[in-house]
UniProtKB/Swiss-Prot annotation:
ATP binds at N47, Y470, R566, H594. This is Polyphosphate kinase. One of its GO terms (biological process) is polyphosphate biosynthetic process. Keywords: ATP-binding, Kinase, Magnesium, Metal-binding, Nucleotide-binding, Phosphoprotein, Transferase. InterPro entries: PP_kinase, PP_kinase_C_1, PP_kinase_middle, PP_kinase_middle_dom_sf, PPK_C_dom2, PPK_N_dom, PPK_N_dom_sf. It comes from Exiguobacterium sibiricum (strain DSM 17290 / CCUG 55495 / CIP 109462 / JCM 13490 / 255-15). Mg(2+) binds at R377, R407. The active site is at H437. It is an enzyme of class 2 (transferase). The keyword Zinc-finger does not apply. GO terms for molecular function: ATP binding; metal ion binding; polyphosphate kinase activity. The gene is ppk. It holds the Pfam family PP_kinase. Belongs to the polyphosphate kinase 1 (PPK1) family.
Length: 719
């Protein structure tokens, strides 16, 4: 039997759509607070936008270039993948708008209404009329489309209205476009009689209601909202360039104007002539057109949530207060504490504050000589950037690798790079054709007359905002072997020369893949000898074929394998004779599962590694990543307990079957929602937990009312 046959794999693109389907499942999950369900509609839409701009855009490029080679797992050609994507996406979008109707109906029952113009009362009608005249009309620009004024280049993801016009005397018909201004809020908060209620109208509905005023002497026969998504998969041709920053700045300007790859139209406003015109101008096929049964672009759910939803605290998640890691005292200098022991941080259950505090203390400590750090994505008002600038201004040697090719953060990172350079930091951009995705900080300090190095390693970005929403692992250490590796790592990044030999770390694209394959091979050998082989791996996505085939070999040898893969999973479990010893689950909940953790039983030695890398082809072969060990037994036990809770999840976990489909995990006698229970466990408030050896055996009883045991942050409420 060939274990690398196409029938034993899932296609990457379809697997991603299945992940987004699980996100959509959070909209329909009535256990979630209502406004959170509405927000998940925005997450689904935002995810799909990026998928089309990057993945579908890349496949379209391959088709246009005449590239017809099948991908290396299911052996589907680019054209076959595009057809499969369109079929699955149309199915999901239909489900999304059914969910939108259900959620908005439920919001209406809570006193939150989305109104059409013909549903407004007299007071609201007058308000909207004035609002349009004073705030909307001045910024609108009607654009005629005819022989002298060709179809304009509309930017990607902009919302527009196509209009069919007829002269009042009936002498001629014309076409025109009106862009819905992105500078105005997408929804208008309306006056209401009852202060306990909220009513809004969407901006495009306001414009359509008064669109006649833009075309004097014409009747508007039809007004059809539409939205174009353009290819944003722009390759940066780095070879031969002398200034990567300027190259990327130049290429970014093209992103808004890439080839059209998707057209969204509003189903209840379709005009055949307008639709045909758009299809021809954009050179799209029927499968690229999505008629939606509701407002186009539900990403406005984010703004609605932050501006209106938060006023209804019974409709949103209660804020969980993160805790300081045990034994880490805020009153003491971090350097002194890290010298005494390693500290493991598990965000967002542990606060991200110690990481910020470390950089701030280093920036202002006269004994700190140098700070070196990699940055991939940071927050909009980053305290990390501020501290690094302060350090440079204080005369310290500051070296920062800013990854300019971080997708959709390129412009922000260019600005950060300029600011850091202006402050006196040495800014580098990494290696040609490789993204630096590693998360590492090295601080060099004069400690009692000798050089002492401090290191932070993590699975997630140095982003204080996403650290509240993403689960990640971080390690603070002063261990000499890791410190030496960190020094060599930064010297390799900033200088020339081959990658050094490592003491404790492993990196891609050089040694990490080989390390993982070796660890799996060792587990096979131990199982054949002792019968106790086991692998537990948690990650965002799994696409690397060499690792998948090696896991199949381990499964056939009898090794017990549990994979927690939130997103794409090209491995297919539970296939007799191939992967029957592999279980794959995915947890989608309030926090985005982002940590990468790898456990190998190793005949009782319990090897645990964390990494910035997933088991993906791009991470193993096209990015600079770091794999680091967890050595402390107490920290290893904590990670094993968290993995056990995640494997035992029967509320938010879905399990993949042998056909590649996902289903909710079967409920047992008691519910286990892993994120809630991990918070309790981290806070020291969980009375019992599942065993790591047998997490599915329900012989433990957690607290009965978990949510009451967590410390919540009080919020003001409208209701």
């Amino acid at each position: 039997m060939k274990i690398d046959s196409p029938e034993f794999f899932n296609n990457r693109e379809i697997s991603w759509l299945q992940f987004n389907e699980r996100v959509l499942g959070e909209v329909t999950d009535t256990r979630n607070p209502l406004m959170e369900r509405f927000k998940f509609l925005g997450i689904f839409s935002s995810n799909l936008d990026e998928f089309y701009m990057v993945r579908v855009g890349g496949l379209k490029d391959e088709v246009l270039a005449g590239f017809n080679k099948p991908e290396n797992k299911q052996q589907l050609t680019p054209k076959q993948q595009l057809r499969a994507i369109a079929t699955k996406t149309k199915e999901l979008v239909d489900q999304q708008y059914e969910a939108f109707k259900d959620v908005t109906q439920a919001l209406k029952a809570e006193g939150i209404s989305f109104l059409k113009h013909d549903e407004l009362n007299e007071m609201q009608s007058e308000y909207v009329k004035t609002f349009f005249r004073e705030q909307v009309f001045p910024v609108l620009t009607p654009v005629a489309v005819d022989a002298y004024r060709p179809f304009p280049m509309l930017s990607s993801k902009s919302l527009n209205i196509a209009t069919a016009l007829e002269a009042e005397d009936g002498s001629k018909r014309n076409l025109a476009l009106v862009q819905v201004p992105a500078v105005l809020p997408r929804f208008v908060d309306l006056p209401v009689d009852d202060e306990e209620t909220t009513a809004v109208i969407l901006l495009e509905d306001v414009i359509i209601s008064f669109i006649d005023s833009l075309f004097k002497g014409y009747h508007v026969l039809s007004a059809m909202p539409f939205r174009i998504t353009r290819n944003a998969d722009l390759p940066f041709h780095e070879e031969g360039t002398h200034d990567l920053l300027k190259l990327i700045e130049k290429e970014l300007k093209k992103r808004r104007w890439g080839v059209g790859i998707r057209l969204e139209i509003q189903k209840n406003a379709i005009n055949t002539n307008l639709l045909n015109m758009l299809r021809d101008v954009l050179d799209l096929q029927d499968r690229d057109i999505y008629a939606v049964d509701g407002p186009i672009d539900l990403t406005f759910a984010f703004a609605f949530y932050s501006q209106i939803g938060v006023e209804y605290d019974h409709l949103i998640y209660q804020t969980i207060m993160p805790v300081e890691p045990p034994a880490l005292e805020k009153s003491k200098k971090l350097f002194d504490q890290i010298l005494q022991q390693d500290y493991l941080l598990h965000h967002p259950y542990h606060t991200f504050d110690p990481i910020v505090r470390l950089i701030v203390q280093a920036a202002n400590d006269p004994n700190v000589l140098a700070i070196k750090q990699t940055l991939y994505r940071v927050s909009g008002d980053s305290p990390i950037i501020k501290a690094l600038k302060t350090a440079a201004e204080n005369g310290k040697q500051v070296t920062v690798l800013v990854e300019l090719k971080a997708r959709f953060d390129e412009a922000k990172n260019i600005e950060w790079a300029k600011q850091l350079e202006k402050a006196g930091a040495h800014v580098i951009y990494g290696y040609s054709d490789l993204k630096t995705h590693s998360k590492i900080t090295l601080i060099v300090r004069l400690q009692e007359g000798r050089i002492q190095r401090f290191v932070h390693l993590g699975t997630g970005n140095y982003n204080d905002s996403t650290a509240k929403l993403y689960t990640d692992i971080g390690l603070l250490t002063a261990k000499e072997q890791i410190a030496e590796d960190a020094t060599n790592f930064f010297n390799w990044l900033s200088g020339y020369g081959e990658q050094p030999e490592w003491n404790a770390l492993h990196t891609s694209p050089n040694s990490m893949l080989e390390k993982f394959l070796s660890l799996i091979d060792e587990e096979i050998k131990y199982h054949k000898k002792h019968g106790n082989g086991r692998i537990v791996a948690k990650m965002n996505s799994l696409t690397e074929k060499d690792i998948i085939v090696k896991l199949y070999q381990a499964s056939r040898a009898g090794v017990r394998i549990e994979l927690i893969v939130r997103g794409v999973c090209c491995l297919r479990p539970q296939i007799k004779g191939v992967s029957e010893n592999i279980r794959v689950t995915s947890v989608v909940d309030r926090y985005l599962e982002h940590s990468r953790i790898f456990y190998f039983h190793h005949n009782g030695d319990d090897l645990i590694y964390c990494s910035s890398a997933d088991w993906m082809t791009r991470n193993m072969r096209k990015r600079i990543e770091i794999l680091f060990p967890i050595a402390d037994e107490e920290q290893k036990n904590y990670i094993k307990d968290c993995l056990a809770l995640t494997m035992a999840d029967n509320v938010k976990a879905r399990e993949q079957d042998d056909s590649g489909n996902y289903h909710y995990v079967t409920k047992g006698k008691q519910e286990c929602e892993s994120q809630i229970l991990i918070q309790l466990y981290t806070n020291g408030k969980l009375k019992a937990k599942p065993s790591f050896e047998h997490p599915l055996e329900q012989k433990w009883t957690p607290v009965e009312r978990a949510e009451e045991k967590i410390t919540f942050d009080p919020t003001t409420s409208k209701k």
